[in-house]
Amino acid sequence: FLSLIPHAINAISAIANHL
């Protein structure tokens, strides 16, 4: 589960950057 956290943060960051 901990290994998924950076991926989730990266996805959120990419979405925020797209907005």
Swiss-Prot record:
Modified residues (Leucine amide): L19
Organs and tissues of expression: Expressed by the skin glands.
Cellular localisation: Secreted
Keyword Secreted: yes
Keyword Secreted assigned: yes
Function: Has antimicrobial activity.
Family: Belongs to the frog skin active peptide (FSAP) family. Phylloseptin subfamily.
The protein's name in its UniProt record: Phylloseptin-J3
Lineage: Eukaryota, Metazoa, Chordata, Craniata, Vertebrata
